[in-house]
A protein has these predicted regions:
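Structured-RNA-binding interfaces characteristic of tRNA pseudouridine synthases
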Residues: 2-244
Length: 244
């Protein structure tokens, strides 16, 4: 009799250029990262596989290491999935690493796991075509120290309802931001935010508000006012996706 393979859960770390995709999550009217991964896995294993991602990134957003899992009975060694999938994926999606995790391991519901996002701003007099895909262009001078002063109000546990899209489909809008660092090197400003989780559009709205602080439209204290208002707001004009 044929030996039945054991179901295993495989974890993958996925990097991608999101420019040509309608985000992570499968959409009826656009190509997504999840769809490409599912199709590659189905071709590889001959199983009907659906990946579960840690971060459902928006259209145009990039990733260096989005974590996802899938269940399979395939005998392929866990560490070989990365190589095998990369042969079947477009060049703008790469599985950096693969390993096996317990069957109850879920990328979104693990204790003591943090997520880090970076938002890149290219701040110069004229755009740089080599930066356009991965940075948001701002031609006006930016006060980085003012941005840092405003960012301090966002660190800690807060109700971030003012910093999420009105389409956010959760009742619990409390999140903890562990760190929000703003670095400037040459013509590039990088906002690096680490937290226990993020609401829909939260990082892009944080970036949008801090860009306004940097340009002098808002005082740093305005960040606290927006946070304390606890209402969905468009004041932070969501920053474009390509910088994330």
């Amino acid at each position: 009799k044929g030996k039945k393979n054991i179901m295993r859960r495989i974890r993958i770390f996925v990097a991608y250029d999101g420019t040509n995709y309608c985000g992570w999550q499968i959409q009826p009217n656009g190509i997504t990262i999840e769809e490409k991964l599912n199709k590659a896995l189905n071709r590889l294993t001959r199983e009907d596989i659906r990946v579960i991602g840690a971060s459902r990134t928006d259209s145009g957003v990039h990733a260096l290491g989005n974590v996802a899992v899938f269940d399979t009975e395939s005998p392929i060694p866990p560490e070989r999935f990365s190589y095998a999938l990369n042969q079947r994926l477009p060049e703008d999606i790469v599985v950096v690493k693969s390993d096996e995790v317990p069957l109850d391991w879920h990328p979104r519901y693990q204790e003591n796991i943090s997520k880090t996002y970076e938002y890149h701003i290219y701040n110069a007099a004229v755009p740089n075509p080599l930066k356009t895909r991965y940075c948001t262009f701002v031609s006006f001078p930016m006060d980085v120290e003012a941005m840092r002063a405003g960012a301090k109000y966002l660190v800690g546990e807060h109700d971030f309802v003012s910093f999420c899209n009105i389409r956010t489909n959760t009742q619990d809008t409390v999140r903890t931001v562990y760190d929000l660092i703003i670095e400037k090197k040459d013509d590039e400003i990088v906002l690096r935010v680490t937290g226990n989780g993020f609401l829909y559009n939260m990082v892009r709205i944080i970036a949008g508000v801090l860009i306004r602080v940097g340009r002098g439209f808002y005082a740093p204290e305005k960040v606290k006012e927006i946070l304390d208002a606890k209402v969905h707001t468009s004041e932070g004009a969501t920053a474009p996706p390509n910088g994330l």
